[in-house]
């Protein structure tokens, strides 16, 4: 963290440390809880955090507070990101570099909530099917697609078979299974 008057320090990034950041670091100056419509995004990887979350953050900084962003970790490997974001009040720093090498740090505050599907898939389905959810977006890397060796959809993949077998209290575990469960609930 670049702290005002102290240079680089190892202070944790949290909502309470934002006022102590160096003025060169852009910080969210809006009510992070505000927003009556929401975007639920599955797959909160680096691409999402550097693009969609940044765009939503910039809109909110400009006073457009209608939209809030909920992130969803779908895979077990997303646990590390969930833990890191939880320790930082769902804040993170995005550093961009201009063609001339100038760096710009910005704390992104658009992520109002992070849900972790492996532990609470029903919370994810609740968010996806909520009336205030207007947009469901996702970024899935090639490893997240349920394909066979030829790149074709594989109805026999472990995740697809688990989703198809889900019944009653069982919740799907794949991104598409979660979206389908939410769509069925919204009917």
Region annotations inferred by a language model:
Residues 5-187:
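Non-transmembrane, aqueous-exposed alpha-helical and coiled segments at domain scale
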């Amino acid at each position: 963290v670049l702290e005002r008057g102290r240079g680089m320090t190892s202070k944790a990034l949290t909502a309470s440390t934002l006022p102590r950041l160096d003025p060169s670091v852009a910080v969210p100056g809006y009510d992070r809880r505000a927003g009556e419509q929401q975007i639920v995004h599955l797959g909160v990887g680096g691409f999402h955090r550097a693009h969609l979350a940044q765009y939503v953050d910039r809109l909110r900084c400009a006073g457009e507070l209608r939209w809030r962003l909920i992130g969803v970790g779908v895979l077990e490997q997303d646990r590390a990101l969930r833990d890191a974001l939880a320790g930082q009040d769902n804040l993170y720093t995005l550093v961009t570099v201009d063609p001339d090498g100038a760096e710009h740090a910005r704390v992104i505050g658009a992520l109002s909530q992070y849900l972790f599907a492996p532990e609470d898939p029903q919370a994810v389905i609740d968010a996806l099917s909520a009336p205030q959810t207007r947009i469901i977006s996702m970024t899935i890397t090639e490893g997240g697609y349920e394909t066979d060796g030829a790149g074709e959809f594989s109805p026999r993949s472990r995740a697809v078979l688990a989703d198809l077998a889900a019944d009653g209290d069982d919740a799907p575990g794949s991104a598409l299974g979660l979206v389908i469960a939410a769509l069925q609930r919204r009917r």
